[in-house]
Structures are given as C-alpha cells and as structure tokens.
C-alpha cells in the first residue's frame, strides 16, 4: 500500500548541471559565463540581510501620519484620580478638589490623621466603670479633710496574731488569757525534745548485732 501511494505522487524534478546549461544556453549555443566573485558576494549579502531591514526601508518610503503631541493625547483622556476610584468603590461622591492639585499620598495620610482622635481628647478611663469614678471623686473632694479616724495601728509581731486591744471591763481578763497562752507556748517550746536527744534514746533501745 505504501509503495502504491508513493507512485501516485509526482516526483520532484532533479537539477543536473548538464541539463541546466542546456536549458539556459539552448541547443547549439555557448554556455553563459560563470558569475564573478563580486556577483557571488552580492548574492550572499542579499541573502544574509534580514527581512526587518527591508521592511523598514520600504516603510521609510511611505508618507508618515502627522505627529500628535503627547499632551494632546493626555488631554483627550478623562483624568481619573485616586479619590474618584476610592469613592466609586465605597459608594460615596467625591467632595474634595481634584487630585491634579493635591498629592494622593498627602490626601490619604491627612484623612487617616483626621479620623484618628488625639490622645488628649480620649478619657483616661473607658468602659462602664469610667462613669462610676466621676461621682466618687466629686464626693471625696467635697468631703472636708478632718482628723484621722480613731483606730490604733495594729502591728504584726513574729509569733503573734493581730488582735484589737481589750476594751473597758474585759481588759484584765483578756490580758490574763493572752499572757497565759504566751507562757504556755514558751513552756511547750522549752520542754520539746531536740532531735539529737530523740536519736540517742532510739539508739540506746535498739539491739546490738555483733558480727562473727
């Protein structure tokens, strides 16, 4: 099948030097002179020349359209500022002047600084407890500064508990009980055996084992 398909296709013509000379010169005519070295160099240079250069050369011969300045092109387009874009996204109409006279960065930073309240304007305390501190401070300031209350300073001593001093008729009985408790604690601390004496008594009662 493949051979039959190949036979149906027309073969490409083969180029031979003898047949080429016969076709160019014709029968009974002398062959044309061989090209010189200059012709060969010219043909090589034409082949080596890129097509982009030829296109540029042909384009230079055609008349160019009139040159329009860049400013005219810019004026033709509507000026869209950053403010307009942000206003479109936020759904608000721009109220400030156009951004051609104002720097967008300065405008943005100015807006952010205006939105942030100053630290002086902020109250020192925030939340529900802030409203309770005001009347308390006013009441404290309205009260006259008098003498300190008649409470005795209670000092904590090592080994003793805080207790108010006895009053009137209970003074003698409370004082006696307090002194009795302190003396009992002192006697108990004196009669407590030391750990060294306890160990000695234990060692004396333990049986002695002699090694053989």
Swiss-Prot record:
Q: Where is the composition biased (Basic and acidic residues)?
A: 113-124
Q: What is its main location?
A: cytoplasm
Induction (UniProt): By progesterone, testosterone and, to a much lower extent, estrogen. Induced by oxidative stress via FOXO3 activation. Up-regulated by hypoxia (at protein level).
Q: In which tissues is it expressed?
A: Expressed in various tissues, including pancreas, placenta, ovary, testis and kidney.
Alphabetized, the UniProt keywords read: Autophagy, Cytoplasm, Mitochondrion, Peroxisome
Query: Which superkingdom?
Result: Eukaryota
Q: Name one GO biological process term.
A: regulation of autophagy
Q: Which Pfam families match?
A: DEPP
Q: Where in the cell is it found?
A: Cytoplasm; Peroxisome; Mitochondrion
Q: Which segments carry the region annotation Disordered?
A: 20-39, 49-79, 113-176
InterPro entries registered for this protein in UniProt: DEPP
This protein's GO CC annotations: cytoplasm; intracellular membrane-bounded organelle; mitochondrion; peroxisome
PANTHER family assigned to the protein according to its UniProt record, in alphabetical order: PROTEIN DEPP1
Tell me the function of this protein: Acts as a critical modulator of FOXO3-induced autophagy via increased cellular ROS.
Name this protein carries in UniProt: Protein DEPP1
Which lineage ranks, top first, belong to the organism behind this chain?
A: Eukaryota, Metazoa, Chordata, Craniata, Vertebrata
- Gene behind this chain? DEPP1
């Amino acid at each position: 099948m493949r051979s039959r398909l190949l036979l149906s296709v027309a073969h490409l013509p083969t180029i031979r030097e003898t047949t080429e000379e016969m076709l160019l010169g014709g029968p009974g005519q002398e062959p044309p002179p061989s090209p010189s070295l200059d012709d060969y160099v010219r043909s090589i240079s034409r082949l080596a020349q890129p097509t982009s250069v030829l296109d540029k050369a042909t384009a230079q011969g055609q008349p160019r359209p009139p040159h329009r300045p860049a400013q005219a092109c810019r004026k033709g387009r509507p000026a869209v500022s950053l403010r307009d874009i942000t206003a479109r996204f936020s759904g608000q109409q721009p109220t400030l002047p156009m951004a051609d006279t104002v720097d967008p960065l300065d405008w943005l930073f100015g807006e952010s600084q205006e939105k942030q309240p100053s630290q002086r304007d902020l109250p020192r305390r925030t939340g529900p407890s802030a409203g309770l501190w005001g009347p308390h401070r006013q009441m404290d300031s309205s009260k006259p500064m008098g003498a300190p209350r008649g409470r005795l300073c209670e000092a904590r001593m090592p080994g003793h508990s805080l207790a108010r001093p006895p009053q009137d008729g209970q003074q003698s009985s409370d004082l006696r009980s307090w002194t009795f408790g302190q003396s009992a604690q002192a006697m108990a601390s004196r009669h407590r055996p030391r750990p060294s004496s306890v160990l000695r008594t234990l060692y004396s009662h333990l049986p002695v084992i002699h090694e053989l």
